[in-house]
Amino acid sequence: RQGGINFIVNAEPDSFAQRFARLHGPSICAIAFRVNDVKTAYERALSLGAWGYAGVAGPGELNIPAIKGIGDSLIYFVDKWRGKNGAQPGDIGNIGFFDVDFEPLPGVGADALHAPGHGLTYIDHLTHNVHRGRMAEWAGFYERLFNFREVRYFDIEGQVTGVKSKAMTSPCGKIRIPINEEGNEKAGQIQEYLDRYAGEGIQHIALGSTDLLKTVDALRAAGVTLLDTIDTYYELVDKRIPGHGENVTELKQRKILIDGKAGELLLQIFS
């Protein structure tokens, strides 16, 4: 856990997660949306055509409802989290899902979610890769069930392959899901993912940082492998993005990518 990011590594034998891993390999088998009321959100989703998933809760665990999402994955509904509706530490009822279903490690307090870690603070987006011709269908899935709206559309035609993408965003603006498909019949990186994953699914998770340079330094020091970028990329930054205001030497040293325009920059790096 770090900032507003919570990952669960599920190694439970004979579980949905284990069966999912056998089919798709190491991947994302489920995500969870925070909602004000689980019962209302779940029943609404079912009434709009979602397929429910009947999970089995262990003794003392919360019974968390879920629906079937993209590529055999699940979408859970959670309405218990620390700080909900402005609750403060020590307030009655200020407990979360992790307080009920998990036990903290020795020496780790209940407020470990505030640990500084490597400067990662939130989940920026969850990119879905789908078969060609299915982008609109999955965009409609999130629009119909969760009132997401399309905020951007891309149709990028490369020399060999292309990509089409719809960027969907939740009403609160905190959940962003780009949905990608191949832009033409020539197989590219999206089809490569579909082949390796054995179907449609969540291709990557993007994590936000308040200081990407410091975060990259910390991640590399911790042994995390990040993708390289050729030096000539940085020779063209000033021409490609006039007035960007970033220190290109610092970006080059860390192999951080820069896109956008002055005042609307995106700094990113891939693992």
Model-predicted segments: where are they?
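Active-site and NAD+-binding cores of ADP-ribose-processing enzymes
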Residues: 155
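Glyoxalase I/VOC metalloenzyme domain signal
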Residues: 1-54, 61, 66-150, 159-271
